[in-house]
């Protein structure tokens, strides 16, 4: 690969001297979007949770456990692995923000579990995540690139995880939300999706910047690698989806959602879509549930979700409004 000038010593970061304005733009977006799971009233979903069948509850817990694994990988390995490849100190700072928020996402699922589920059911779900071959396989695939020595391939794997691999799981809370179930949980997932949209966009952008520094042969090799990796991940994801959703008859809908987001991941990397439009016609109710207050899904420019609350509710007094 061509020579890329990496940071070779530590200097005090100066946000008044930004080499790439995208770093400052994304930093501001991520910090402006900051949220914590404790501020989302998931307990309001307890009555709704009680209307689900035993299998639906098990499926939902398994979906969230799978998402927890991906967030754990991205927070402790994936985003961190990108830091040594950063071209600017501000890029390093954005990756540390991404890593932290991935850990917040992983924590969020535990908040959902502790609110809605018994300890025994939680333990069963995590045991399932350790034993499910397709879930473990996708973890192994991305981890081998995170631990490799090719920076641009790391960014491809990271973008595919952020913009594609999460979505077999994100489908289910949007499905429940479209049926007026687990709506507060869905609000939390929308906050996660909003973050992941920025993460995938930014890492894909940095990939494109790095790709432009390579010669034509290397660029073609990386493009071929990207599509090969996507095919490998997609085939595994289809099996994972079948395992989760076959019994409730949602598999084909979820696969359309997967293909739709696979195309988005490729776009983040600067490549053309792989799947034709008739294979990505996602259920409109799901797209609407993704962003109920906007015409565009993945609207990460909006504020916190509609259920997001700050602090506990208290009675106000006249002097509270004297600013």
Name what the model sees in each region.
Residues 1-323:
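Non-heme di-metal
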């Amino acid at each position: 690969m061509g020579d890329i000038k990496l940071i070779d010593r530590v200097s005090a970061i100066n946000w008044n001297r930004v080499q790439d304005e995208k770093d400052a733009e994304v930093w501001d977006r991520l910090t402006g979007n900051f949220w914590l799971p404790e501020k989302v009233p998931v307990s309001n979903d307890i009555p709704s949770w009680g209307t689900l069948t035993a299998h639906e509850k098990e499926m939902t817990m398994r979906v969230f456990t799978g998402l927890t694994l991906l967030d754990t990988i991205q927070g402790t390995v994936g985003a961190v692995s990108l830091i040594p490849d950063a071209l600017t100190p501000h890029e390093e700072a954005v990756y540390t923000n991404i890593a932290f928020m991935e850990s917040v996402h992983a924590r969020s699922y535990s908040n959902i579990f502790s609110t809605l589920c018994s300890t025994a059911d939680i333990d069963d779900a995590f045991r399932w995540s350790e034993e499910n071959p397709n879930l473990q396989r996708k973890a192994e695939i991305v981890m081998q690139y995170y631990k490799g020595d090719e920076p641009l391939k790391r960014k491809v794997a990271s973008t595919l995880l952020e913009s594609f691999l999460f979505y077999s799981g994100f489908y289910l809370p949007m499905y429940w939300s479209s049926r007026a179930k687990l709506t507060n949980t869905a609000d939390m997932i929308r906050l996660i999706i909003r973050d992941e949209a920025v993460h995938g966009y930014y890492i894909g952008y940095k990939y494109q910047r790095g790709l432009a520094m390579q010669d034509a042969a290397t660029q073609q090799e990386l493009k071929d690698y990207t599509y090969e990796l996507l095919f490998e991940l997609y085939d595994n994801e289809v099996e994972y989806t079948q395992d989760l959703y076959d019994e409730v008859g949602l598999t084909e809908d979820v696969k359309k959602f997967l293909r739709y987001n696979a195309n988005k991941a490729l776009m983040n990397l600067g490549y053309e879509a792989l799947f034709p439009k008739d294979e990505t016609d996602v259920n409109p109710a799901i797209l609407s549930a993704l962003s109920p207050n906007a015409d565009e899904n993945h609207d990460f420019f909006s504020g916190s979700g509609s259920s997001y609350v700050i602090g506990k509710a208290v009675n106000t007094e006249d002097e509270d409004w004297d600013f």
